[in-house]
């Protein structure tokens, strides 16, 4: 999910724009998928419950079917709390509720939310419903911090980003509206004639 939402940490979003609607649709699909799988929502690349010979958690991209292009996205079920923190920039009420659910389930550690909760049956210990990935990745904690600051401190990073005159000069690009109709091209008369009478093959 971070591919959709990480830019929102520093770039403002405008109502009824292509960017806003895309981000809201991505979060809505995440919420829907969480309900379908009966787990908290928020899937993004993260560590998961598998370690190497040095007991280091492995890391890879996870996603929701319908949002990602990778095949087999439904084979894994790994929830990354930082994804919900990113969603604070788009759907704050829904994200707060989900973060509260994650906290109530005990997915908080000494430094914030744990890296991930792995619900994939092949990686969950016998007799358990899930496995907590008990690690803290600095970049995910940083994204979470910015998501919390976005809501609690009135979008400070967006204000800072837009205070640069060079960035402000391109602000209109962030305000691109969703097209109401598709563009159509009218062929030239010569093209129509050529298509109607293709040259004979020798």
Where are these regions (language model features)?
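Ser/Thr/Asn(+Pro)-rich, low-complexity disordered segments
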Residues: 1-202
């Amino acid at each position: 999910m971070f591919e959709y939402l990480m830019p929102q940490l520093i770039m403002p979003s405008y109502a009824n724009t292509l960017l806003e609607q895309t981000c809201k649709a991505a979060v809505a699909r995440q919420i829907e998928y969480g309900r379908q799988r009966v787990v908290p929502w928020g899937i993004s690349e993260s560590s998961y419950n598998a370690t190497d010979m040095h007991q280091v958690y492995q890391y890879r991209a996870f996603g929701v079917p319908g949002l990602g292009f990778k095949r087999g996205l439904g084979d894994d079920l790994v929830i990354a709390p930082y994804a919900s923190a990113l969603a604070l920039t788009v759907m704050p009420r829904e994200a707060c509720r989900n973060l509260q659910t994650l906290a109530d389930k005990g997915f908080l550690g000494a430094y914030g939310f744990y890296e991930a909760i792995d619900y994939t049956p092949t990686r969950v210990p016998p007799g358990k419903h899930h496995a907590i990935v008990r690690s803290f990745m600095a970049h995910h904690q940083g994204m979470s911090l910015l998501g919390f600051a976005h809501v609690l401190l009135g979008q400070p990073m967006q204000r800072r980003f837009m205070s640069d005159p060079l960035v402000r000069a391109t602000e209109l690009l962030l305000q691109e509206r969703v097209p109401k109709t598709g563009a159509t091209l009218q062929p030239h008369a010569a093209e129509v004639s050529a298509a109607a009478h293709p040259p004979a093959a020798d």
